[in-house]
Amino acid sequence: MPGTAGSIWCLTCHGDVEVDYHHTTEDVGIALGQAFARALGDMRGIQRYGSFHLPMDEALILCAVDLSGRCTLNWDIHCTTEKVGDFDVECAKEFWLGFARSVPATVHFVQFAGENTHHILEACFKGAGHALARP
């Protein structure tokens, strides 16, 4: 996501992934949200709104962001599997909830098409990078 938004960030996280990825994924979302908020500073001179439709093969996802100072996550994403490799698909929503709370921002994800869970989630993250590059 940060590379797509025009910058490159490096984050190292050590979590209890031998149990599951839930808390680690949520904590990464929180940490990136806090870093993004610090990078925005007082938000002077930025556009408040950004959105992007991203096609990833058969998947089509809209990500819309409002840097409102209020936390809302609308997750209208419907994946066909519970896992991508070892990753629990529900953790993607937890990542974005942690991110939205930490900025704070309103973030919407809407799925228009898609069956392959990998493509759907990849479109969410890349679409968010493009939407966040617009404000």
Put a short name on every predicted segment.
Residues 1-135:
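Structural preference for solvent-exposed beta-strand-turn elements
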